[in-house]
């Protein structure tokens, strides 16, 4: 049996020494990096690694000793959020479904910041597993202040009529019911000034023909955010949503057509895809006291991918 390729070691982000901004690949440069990977793709297997360097980011202890549970934190945006929270002083529970190697790399990066980290291998489609994840977070890390709903499933299909029923159910069960189950499990333990942050998507506002089912769930997440914000506002618990544009993560080579991968990010004003370490600071804003008067907000981090709902 072939040995599992170890995850490439991501350089540990510096808390206090921002450097020059890295060069980000443009959409025109993506063709040379394009590859197709099987789903679920491991970040460790990507030729062009998503940027997690946080080279221009300066931490300021904005989440000191807070406890965060981040779903889908083994790779991509979720990993970047976990690392950014750790840089700001939080302890992090990393919830993931399948990719142990990637999850262990996230744990290494969190612990490199001097923070505690636990791994929770769970399926957010199962309400009982969501409750168990919250119980373990509270028991092993000492509480829960921040829930980040980020786990997601997508699979592109050229023809809407051909989307299999199994795919549609998995997409909705993961992307919207999973968020609901996690919120239901977490809310009884959240206090004033704690928060929930959901990951939406610009395609939940604009639509996209090859991801119809996924777009529907992201639109539902935006509505869930606003509804929960009104429900939890009287208790001082904030609920917000980060709305990314195209971001370079393992989902792209695993779920998108090759012709889309080869020009990924072409449709935005900045003419390139975002990198995970460019998205994570929005989550820090919403989790920290800097966002204390923000609730029910859809925070666009899209590189200029516009929608009529901005």
Predicted regions and their residues:
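Alpha-helical segment proximal to the catalytic Tyr-Lys
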Residues: 188-189, 230-234, 292
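Active-site helix of classical SDR
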Residues: 183, 217, 225
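Short C-terminal tail/terminal secondary-structure segment
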Residues: 33, 51-55, 157, 206, ...
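A conserved structural motif in NAD(P)-dependent oxidoreductases
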Residues: 268-279
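Conserved mid-core segment of classical short-chain dehydrogenase/reductases
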Residues: 3, 28-31, 126, 131, ...
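Short, flexible catalytic-loop segment of classical short-chain dehydrogenase/reductase
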Residues: 243-254
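Residue(s) in the substrate-gating loop at a strand-loop-helix junction
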Residues: 201
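Catalytic Tyr-X3-Lys loop
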Residues: 145, 161-180, 197, 221, ...
């Amino acid at each position: 049996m072939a040995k599992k390729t170890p995850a490439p070691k991501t350089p540990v982000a510096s808390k206090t020494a921002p450097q020059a901004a890295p060069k980000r690949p443009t959409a025109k440069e993506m063709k040379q990096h394009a590859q197709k990977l099987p789903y679920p793709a491991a970040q460790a297997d990507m030729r062009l690694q998503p940027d997690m360097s946080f080279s221009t980011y300066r931490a300021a202890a904005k989440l000191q000793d807070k406890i965060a549970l981040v779903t889908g934190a083994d790779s991509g945006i979720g990993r970047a959020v976990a690392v950014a929270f750790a840089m700001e002083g939080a302890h992090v529970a990393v919830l993931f479904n399948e990719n142990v190697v990637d999850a262990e790399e996230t744990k290494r990066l969190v612990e490199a910041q001097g923070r505690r980290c636990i791994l929770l291998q769970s399926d957010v489609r199962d309400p009982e597993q969501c409750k168990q994840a919250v119980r373990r977070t509270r028991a092993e890390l000492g509480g829960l202040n921040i829930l980040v709903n980020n786990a997601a499933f997508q699979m592109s299909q050229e023809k809407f009529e051909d989307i299999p029923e199994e795919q549609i159910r998995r997409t909705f069960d993961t992307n919207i019911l999973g968020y609901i189950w996690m919120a239901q499990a977490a809310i009884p333990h959240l206090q004033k000034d704690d928060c929930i942050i959901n990951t939406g998507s610009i395609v939940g506002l604009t639509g996209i023909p090859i991801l119809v089912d996924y777009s529907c769930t992201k639109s539902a997440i935006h509505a869930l955010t606003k509804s929960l914000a009104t429900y939890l506002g009287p208790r001082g618990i904030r609920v917000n949503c980060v709305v990314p544009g195209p971001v370079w993560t393992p989902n792209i080579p695993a779920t998108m057509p090759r012709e889309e991968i080869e020009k990924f990010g072409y449709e935005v004003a900045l003419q390139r895809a975002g990198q995970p370490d460019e998205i994570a600071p929005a989550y820090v804003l919403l989790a920290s006291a800097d966002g204390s008067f923000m609730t029910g907000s859809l925070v666009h981090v899209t590189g200029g991918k516009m929608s009529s709902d901005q």
